[in-house]
Amino acid sequence: MNKATDMTVGNPAKHIITFAIPLILTNFGQQLYMIADAAIVGRGVGVKALAAVGSTDWCYWMILWTVSGLTQGFSTFVSRYFGEKKYKNMNKVIAMSALLCVAIGVILTTVGLFAARPLLMLLNTPRDILDDSTIYLMTMIAGTLIVTAYNMAGSILRAFGDGKTPLYAMVIAASLNIGLDCVFVFLFQWGIFGAAMASVLAQLVSFLFCFLKIRRIEYVHIEGTMWVPDWKLVKELILFGIPIAIQNIIIAFGGILLQSSVNLQGSIFVAGYTATNKVYGLLECSATALGVACCTFFAQNYGAGKFDRLNQGMKITLKIVVAMALTVMSIVLVSRRYLLQLFLNTSEAGGPEALDTGVRYLTIMIVFLVILYLIHIFRNVLQAMENSFWSMVSGFAELICRVFMAKVAIHWIGSDALFISEPVAWTGALLCVMLPYFYYKRKVLN
């Protein structure tokens, strides 16, 4: 039997840090194999192939973040009932969450496959990469049910305070993904289809590993009758998960509108922009992990009514996140050109221009990294305290800022508006979650 981690007792700093470290490594590993995907495509197939992959990013992220938002919302109920020691309710939540994930995965896959090419055309995807972009996006969408299952399994494990199993799953999947990338892209000559297929198969392995671990947790015992739909609970789960999902959808929609303006700059510009976004994913993974650790800690202690521990946990986390952002910023500013050359072959036609685009974008983004890190903390804390409305509002703020920069400011300052749009969007989002947190803290937690 495997025990879960009870965060309602013991040292808050120790709980948050020890739980966050495996998550950081997990996210880091996930980003590394996504980087390996992009690097193999960019340097093995070509700059335009990298642009084709990059032009699909926001479209696929909309699906991925919808799934992530819903499953994160569902798992918050698991954390809360675990903190309250209501194990029967907790198991019912797990069962209903699983059924919802199947339904969500099927719906998103069906809609996504039909909408893929029309959406890419609507987003001004350059004609010289449109076919490859369609192949890559449709292959990734075909694996949506697998990704949904993996996200739910990982979220459940984290709700129990188990951050190590997702890490082990990621190590296995990352190794498999890179190996399959090499086989499918170089040996079979499948191009970007091979890279997408490798990612889907790796996610399947991750899910199976996490699922087997969940079955061994002593608190998880789902009886046959628990699979009977409880429509009241289903409604509660959906109503709680939807604001988080909508927040992510809104952010992704803003990114899609931004991508349409990026695509108009041509495939070489898209390649440089894509290379920076791959590095950006690596930079963000630490903040994402700390946010999830905070969410689990806050959800358990909020459910147990231990508000003094919430204040302690927040102070500790803010110190960690600022120090981490400054450290990452310093390292990347020095090495940014070398990082981008992992994806871009400067000896290829268009390579140097793509590299210059990426360096400029990454420089602007990294200077404001601490804002991004703080967003993840405040969003997750509000969610853990059953106050996900402001997370949704922050998503609207990101949407408005991105659209303004991509569609209005671009006429004033040129393509730099596409780079500056990220820090501007982060600032708007941070204000929408930080101010409500301090109001809620003064009114309720104190």
Language model features: what each stretch is:
Residues 62-65, 177-182, 207-211, 282-285, ...:
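Hydrophobic transmembrane alpha-helices of multi-pass small-molecule transporters
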